[in-house]
Design a protein with these regions (language model features):
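Cofactor-binding beta-sheet edge motifs in enzyme active sites
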Residues: 1-194
Length: 194
């Protein structure tokens, strides 16, 4: 007695990748390879705050505080100016699972790179706006206030850019600050999740 032969319900086929799935970008940390859009990570708000987006869930590990510190450090703003939006499927980048103590390593390195590139772009805009006598990298930034130390002229992130979109990819060509230049990272901060 043989077994009855059934027609398969599903058939496996090789489907082409979805057209909106970006190819990974080499040289970028973790999740930035799949989501290299700067606007997916950082927003300069007109109300003089900065929104940072993460795809990691706050489950007591302090990820909101850590990414806020990293962003504030790279952008040279007070920690109190940073707003963290975590795991909003409409807004946040898809960073996969929150597990294995990898949130700061993955999301943190991505936010750090995104913030460094946002700062670089803002300093280039300020250099033009101020008709600065120094290079963009020599402009001083303190809590979002940008100063050309040679002329004394000033502007801020919010005057330059508040409410706008970057409309550019993260390239990986901008280097974040050296660790010995950090003032916020590695220091105690009030937890944002408590």
């Amino acid at each position: 007695i043989g077994r009855p032969q059934w027609d398969p319900i599903y058939e496996m086929i090789d489907a082409p990748p979805l057209s909106n799935t970006p190819a990974p970008r080499q040289g970028l940390p973790g999740p930035l390879q799949q989501t290299p859009d700067l606007d997916a990570w950082i927003r300069i708000n007109a109300d003089e705050t900065i929104t940072v987006f993460t795809g990691k869930v706050e489950i007591g590990q302090g990820i909101k505080t850590a990414v806020a510190q990293l962003a504030a450090e790279e952008l040279d703003v007070a920690l109190s100016r940073i707003r963290v939006v975590a795991v909003d499927t409409e807004l946040s980048p898809d960073e996969g699972t929150t597990a294995g103590s990898m949130s700061v390593e993955n999301s943190g390195s991505s936010v750090r790179q995104a913030a460094a590139e946002a700062r670089h772009h803002l300093l280039n805009l300020a250099h033009e706006e101020l008709e600065a006598e120094c290079t963009p990298g020599a402009l001083a930034v303190e809590d979002g206030l940008i100063t050309d130390l040679l002329s004394g002229r000033q502007t801020s992130y919010w005057t330059l850019f508040g409410g706008q979109r970057f409309g550019r990819p993260i390239t990986g060509t901008v280097h974040p600050k050296r660790f010995d230049a950090h003032n916020l990272v590695g220091q105690a901060a009030k937890r944002l999740d408590l």
